[in-house]
Amino acid sequence: MAKRHKHFEGRGRGGSRGRGRGRGGSRGRGRGGSRSRGAGRGGFGRSSNDDNWRNSSIPFGDGDLGNFNFADIDVPRGRRVYYSPDDIEDYYFGKSENMESMKMGGLRPGHKREDTPRSSSFRARPVQFIKAKDVYDPSHDLIIKLRSKNLEQESQDEELSQGDAESAREDFESGTEEEIEEEEEVLPEIEREEVEEEEVEPEEVEEEEVEPEEVDSEDAESEEVDDKDLFFIDEEGYNEDTLPTVPSVSISEDSTVKKPQKTNLEFNDILTVGKVEINLAHDASDDGVFVSNVKKNYHPFSGYISQVMKNIQVSDEDDDEDDYEDEEEDFQSDFSYKYEQQTTSKAISADIEKLSISSENLKNSSDISRDNSPDNNEEQESKDPEFGFLEEDFVINTSEVSVTNIRIGFSENSYFLKCYRLFGHYESKWIDQETFLDLILNDLGLPEHRLNAYLTFIRDSLIPKEEPPEPTYSDIHFSDTSEEESDNDSEIGDDMREGIEDLISYATKLEKDRNFEFETKSLQTVGKGKKKKLLVQEDMQLDGVIASELQDKFSTRLDNKAKKRRTKEDFIDQENEKSDDLFKKYPYGLHVLNIKEEFELFIRRSDKEALVFPPLDPHGNKTITKFAKFYFMKTNKRGRGNQTHIFVQKVKATRYNEPNYNIIDNLTRQRPIFMRHDVSKPRNEYQRTERVKLPKGKFHVKEGEVVGQDAPVIDRNNIGRILLERLGWSEGEGLGIQGNKGISEPVFAVVKKSKTGLRHERKKRIE
């Protein structure tokens, strides 16, 4: 059979491509193929949608839109009333933006096509609201029932409360009458007053709780009783065994019934007494005011305030009668309500003017305030013994640290100190407080609880305490009378006045030279290192010989300093100079440059993975750890006690990071020398000197010998003599300026052995 082409498919109405003439199936026989474009009779454009319209089993709009206007949707109308909701949704909410679609409903204002005769336009019918005949409210009946039930319950409670009050009042009145009759029958008139005083206390207590209602005047007149029924004569007396006990009347309290109390006053929760603020609280149940307990003592005077508030007492001089009248009025108005006794421990009267504080309590509160004052706390802290009074203070050697100055800052202080153990030299430097505390606690080993005492000791030694100025007695008047002058003149004799004028003239003559001050300057030098020389200025006008001698002395001074200074070569053992074992290479200690050199050699060698340093003191081990940190290496501590040493290892970061030479150079400028902790120097290296006792020759002097007669004359090469000769002095002259020269010849002292002064005369008298 010959192959049929695509253009033969879908003949008829709505073929696959809309070209067929037949009824239109999938192959040209049905009513429209799947890809029909509406060329046939009544084609909609999409044959699949056409099938959905006709074959859908879902009623359109659940039957609510049965009278749907088909003019809006151009589809073939069949005999069935089922339409596809998907196409309806696509029409109204799809991509189409027709003015009649619901998608554009929010964009068009009002009923735009109200006047158009088209049936496809939206309706313009107004909305009508019709009142229903019956109100459907199921909760309405329940609310009415509950309201009636609550009213019945309230009425029952009121009847019960009124009945209890009336019964209590009747019991109270009957009880009082029976007590009076029993007392009159049993007790004689003589002892009746004593018994009444004893029985007053429980009655008064009960009257405070519940007071009887006063009887109106009309009721009192109607209930008058004859005197015979009230009074009688007791002729028999009574015995103590037959004395009846007087019954007491008590009324049960109803805690549920409370009288509502209203007030028009505003409550302020802070009470200010002088400069003290007190927190108050209000109890809505009994309308009382009390001091709120603060759990945290946020104020240094909180203990004092609480003690004062405990001692506050309410003065009862004027309030007793007023309170009694108020309670009586309230009892008459409504007997069912009763008053709860206010607590006197924390209650505060509404009238602040009536508060009183007893003098004894005020003294106690002042003592408490003195104990809680911050000055007293400082005194208790200062009771710790000063530095130097405990054995723990002598654990460290304070002579190793010499603090000569202190800079007091806002957060921390700086110290200007001299410490060979820290710096490696005897020059003073400024260090911060953290470094100073690390030196005192870790290196020197001072106990931590004595640190404040040590810092206070240093501060007091450098900063003198301010002493009160001496009184000048400027407010005391001294009289200048002739009697005082005569007394002073009598004390000074004529012998004392001799030569005063000469002394005054001599003092005024030398006044300029006496107060002359010389400036002190450090030596000025030129050059560095071995070429360093003393700078001699032309203003000094020194001779060449003197200048050369000064230069020689300055160079000698530098050489002596250089000899004392130790270099890194001094610590290396010559026999083990190239050894990898640092224990043998540095037998006694290391220089800080030796540590840097060992790290440089270690980082260059790829075959060496570990480096072991000899044991040093804690600060030395910490310095090695710092070097390893900035060389990007790992360190571990090994050993115990004086055998503690540092073990250094390379890590992956060592290869890919360059050392931080800026910080490493700063470390080399700090402490220079680190001695080993586990080894001491051999004794044969010390030059031991032995003391040899030689017989001392007695110094003999002769009678009449001049002291210092054989002393040599000062040489002409002496610097002091050269300076004097430059100033104009010559041999045989006295020292000094013209007109005030000293003696030209020295005073001679002659040895005298034959006589011994007063002792000789005393022996002579005894003989």
Swiss-Prot record:
SMART domains cross-referenced by the UniProt entry: G_patch (SM00443)
Pfam families: G-patch (PF01585)
Keywords recorded for this protein, A-Z: Cytoplasm, mRNA processing, mRNA splicing, Nucleus
GO terms for biological process, alphabetical: maturation of SSU-rRNA; mRNA splicing, via spliceosome
MF terms in GO: enzyme activator activity; nucleic acid binding
Superkingdom, taxonomy of origin: Eukaryota
Positions with biased composition (Gly residues): 35-45
Record carries keyword ATP-binding: no
Main function: May be involved in splicing.
Family: Belongs to the SQS1 family.
Name assigned to this protein: Protein SQS1
